[in-house]
Each structure stands twice: as structure tokens, then as C-alpha cells.
Amino acid sequence: MENPYIKQFPQLMAGKKILYVHGFASSGQSGTVSRMRTVMPQATVIAPDLPLHPQEAIDLLRRVCQQEQPHLIVGTSMGGMYTEMLRGYDRIMVNPALQMGDTMVSHNMMGAQHFQNPRQDGVQDFIVTKALVKEYKEITTHCFEGIDENERRRVTGLFGDEDTTVDTFDLFHRHYPRAIRFHGEHRMDDRSFMQSVLPVIRWVDDCQEQRSRPVILVAFESLIDSWGKARGSAQKAYRWLAETYSLYIVAPSLPNEPAQMGEVTRWVEQYINVPAWGRIIFTAHKQLLLGDYLIDPAADSELGGFMGTHIRLGDDTFKTWDEVITFFERLGGQ
């Protein structure tokens, strides 16, 4: 059966190296590695098996970084903890176990354990001792050492809102501003990778390439229905458009209702999530904004002379979001 969440993006990170740092009791042959190689076939994904002892693991990763000079490092769970320490690279940390020693104790990771994925050395089982836990507690004391403003700009943390294993959002956010909650659990699946991790990889790639995409302004009123839910196909359309265009949500700024801004932000986090993080514009004068397109149910006369192309959602040409998708499919990325 075809996986509805997986598709390929040959141009994404094309010709670049991505270092993937796996989680606890995993290996470089995890499903996430296969997923990344499938989705980004022109990128080289490097995924070493990590030694059990943390100092050996971070030493290995630093050697790999020195040899391979990856364009991006992605680390999950325990791998996110190591990723934080790899200074000087663009990095994405997914549900990072920044207090790994404490996590091992609180989630019954002591004693005999089994690797969840095959390893190149053939080892299948291992034992977590108190001494090993102490090693992990010691290594995590080096998280956040020597961070400067440049490092803060190069790191993004993604935190599943259903993660019951690790909760380090607040700890991460005290050091890095780009802390984003996504819809998902601790273990990354196809849906969370495609809808949450991949948009961030796209931002990194665009930044590295200094790539400018056509800008689509999306009126908040075009996304929300009369019941406060997402309009039909609005979520699908937003995610699809974000693969090619630079999208911003435009919401009304009401001077006498400051709480409304928080309500809009929470709605966007719930229904659009990661692709719209940091991309909400609050204004009472959207006609003054610069963009190539504006998707808005308002009539032309209400916009006061928007300089781009106005797509009026709900009129005879664009009755639904599906018709908006068809329009942009025909444009081919223009």
C-alpha cells in the first residue's frame, strides 16, 4: 500500500551531506535514515552507529564532522543531545534528550537492553549500569557550553506535543530561540517527518543557498471556517504550497483585543503547525504588504490596492482550496 505521507524531493539538499545522529538503543540503519534517503535522493545521508559510552560517541561524531563537513546535522532523542554539542553546523534536534542520564533512570532503561535496529558490529544486546548512567549525566553537563549568537541562529529544536519520554522544551528554549512544538510522539514516524522535520530542512537549504521563493500571503480568514476549524483542504493546500513558495499568514491586528493575537497563534499552531512557525503577520493594513500573491476572501475593493495577484477564495474561480491548488499547479512554481 502506498504511503500517503512519503514523496520525493530530488532538489532538496541536492549534492549536500546530512549527518543523522540516532537515538538510544538504535543504529545508523534506523527507519528514519531510510526515510531521509528516500525523500532526498540527491543528498548523502551519513549515519554512523554510535558507541554505547557517551564520550566515545561524541568523539566519533566530532571525527565524522571533521572528515565529512556535513551541511546539516539531524539528531533525535539521545542523538539530539549529541547534536547540540556539535558546534559550527546547521542542526535540527528532534525531541532531544538533553538530560539523558535522568531519562534512563526515570524510564526504566537500566539493566539488560536490546538494540532496536541492526548494527554493523553485530551486537544485539547491552547492559545499562549505574556507572554508564553516571557517564551520561556527566556528558550532558557540557550541553550549551560556549554558545554564541551565531550558534543560536543555526539550531532548531522540534518537540512532539505527545512525547511522554522526554520534555526538554523549556530547557532548550532558555538557550535557543527556535523551539517548535510539532504534532507527534517521541518516535518519529513518516507523518511527523514529512510535516514537521522536512519543512525545517527546507528552510535550512534555502538559507544556505540564499534562495528566494515567490511569496504567498494567506489571509487567516481563508484558513478558518465558521466553526473555528480548518476549512476543507486548507491544511493540505498550505503544506503543498509551502513546498514551492514562501508562505506567510496575515491576521488582523485589533488594537482593543490584544488577546486575539494569542488565539490566532494557538490556532495556527494547532492546524498548520511547523510550516507556519514564525510566519504570522499581524496588521490592520494588509494592502500595504509586499507579496506576489494574496489568498483572501475579501473583495478587491476591501484591499485598497494590493500590488500583487489577489486570489479571492470563495468566488466563482476559486470556490475551494482545491481550486487554488489547481491554479498553482498550472503556474509551475512561478
Question: Where are the regions that the model predicts?
Answer:
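Active-site catalytic motif of lipid deacylating hydrolases and related acyltransferases
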Residues: 5-67
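Asp-based phosphoryl-transfer active-site loop
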Residues: 209-230
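C-terminal cap/substrate-recognition subdomain and adjoining C-terminal extension
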Residues: 258-334
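Short, acidic loop-to-helix structural element flanking the phosphoryl-transfer center
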Residues: 224-248
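Short histidine/acidic/glycine/proline-rich micro-motifs that form metal-
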Residues: 23-27, 51-52, 187, 224, ...
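The alpha/beta-hydrolase serine catalytic core
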Residues: 90-204
